[in-house]
UniProtKB/Swiss-Prot annotation:
Motif (L/FRRG motif): 261-265
Compositional bias of kind Basic and acidic residues: 387-400
Sequence ranges of Low complexity compositional bias: 374-386
Cellular component terms (Gene Ontology): endosome membrane; phagophore assembly site membrane; vacuolar membrane
Subunit record text: Component of the PI(3,5)P2 regulatory complex.
Region (Disordered): 307-402
Keywords on record: Autophagy, Endosome, Membrane, Protein transport, Repeat, Transport, Vacuole, WD repeat
Domain description: The N-terminus might form a beta-propeller domain involved in specific binding to phosphatidylinositol 3,5-bisphosphate (PIP2), leading to the association of the protein to the membrane. The L/FRRG motif is essential for the cytoplasm to vacuole transport (Cvt) pathway, for the recruitment of ATG8 and ATG16 to the PAS in nutrient-rich medium, and for its recruitment to and dissociation from the PAS under starvation conditions.
Organism of origin: Pichia angusta (Yeast)
Family (UniProt): Belongs to the WD repeat PROPPIN family.
This protein's name: Autophagy-related protein 18
Amino acid sequence: MASPNPLAFEAATAAHEVAASYVTEHKPRKNDNINFANFNQDFSCVSVGYSNGYKIYNCEPFGQCYSKSDGSIGIVEMLFSSSLLAIVGMGEQHSLSPRRLKIINTKRQTTICELTFPGAILAVKLNRERLVVLLEETIYIYDINNMRLLHTIETPSNPNGLIALSPSSENNYLAYPSPQKLAPNPQTEVTLHSNPQTVRNGDVIIFDAKTLQPTSVIEAHRTSLAAIALSKDGLLLATASDKGTIIRVFSVATGIKLYQFRRGTYPTKIYSLAFSPDNRFVIASSATETVHIFRLGEEEAANTIKSANKKARLTKAQVPNPLETSPDIYPHNQHTSSDEDEELNEDEEDLDGDEDEDLEDDAHVPVSLQRGRSSSSTGSFHSSESMTDKLKEPLVDNSRKSVARMLRRTSQSLGRKAAEKMGTYLPPKFSSILEPNRHFASLKVPASKETKTVVGVGSKIWDDLIPSVYLKDDANSITETSEDLVNKKLVHIMVITSEGFFYKFGLDPERGGDCVLLHQQSLFG
């Protein structure tokens, strides 16, 4: 292993310290609070609700484009980059009741309409054909062109306002949590006195907002949902449960699980999910301050299928079949679905306990990254590794280096190789931890613990200049030009925090690894 470049480590650490000091210096004033922040449908703008009004910002380049002092605002949603806004107040003024929705034209400075509902509004979603309003137990669907009420849906209690609407008018789907249902428990050994059923809270209803008909129920997780997101084209659904260790991606049309990723080894709160506009990546932010980027490639899809098949075989071989001794007892246990097998991941998520959060970065496995391969997938090292292969290794942010991360990287690389050889001999409880699909890239947000975050992804690849020394790792690579800037083609990963900051990171779409902080801005300017 090459020794760390001290110049690179010093420069990267200094950059990280500058970011942290910027956050400290731009903390909000006593009476300034952010009640709401979100991206618009194509991640080109940010809308923010404050205790004294609301503002709209452009993302590329970042800058304020509209502001209004209008009392305490709890929801501000945009219709792409148009002048149409949906506003809901916090209730501190009579005209800004949390039960009242205002549709505003910012260009004309007029209120198009106001709608009052029987309860507090928890979420508002828009696309070019529909406006959806979510209360705790009711969904209202409107024609956005004339604000005519088209349909209402009674739902189970949804206090967290969990709902997703596709930006696409062609695949105009709505996703929301399904009511609880009883499901078979594949880990319960059936006896005459046992109850082989458990309550399932993690299903998602897919509703066609154009035909106003439900289309399917996707069995996403066994435990309650924490986050859901639909892709820009409405073809993919991403989900995370309240345990927060497994991220899944489904086909909206068929309900088939296409991808499964392991975010980490112990539970955490997932705050947001987002697809890249080209469906190449899905991004997850959590309470660990780390944002994980997962690649939706061919190998990741194959690994998901392979993992499901392996767990199905293991479960079938190790779980006693009660039909052999009691043919009249619970015949459903004769076959365990692959989805139930994969729930072993969630049932055994907290085996490692409260380990250090730095380990959750999972230090990317340094394997060759040809197009279509994942840095987190199992690979083999060749003694004749070429310079081209080295250039394909994941980028490393030297400021995030630690002994824990290096040990983690080595142990995961060895562990996954061992899993390939020994996986068939391990019980599901332990083989589930060796999930082949891990994150392709990650970034660390310079924020306090438990700071809520929302993520977005840029729609194009940018040519960005970054310090060459920032990513150098080879001690022999120090030259007189180490401080020069180098041009990198990067996808922009954007993060908004509840502390009031906007961050822009650069993701190398081919190499993955650690994302580079490119820009940060206070939302209290």
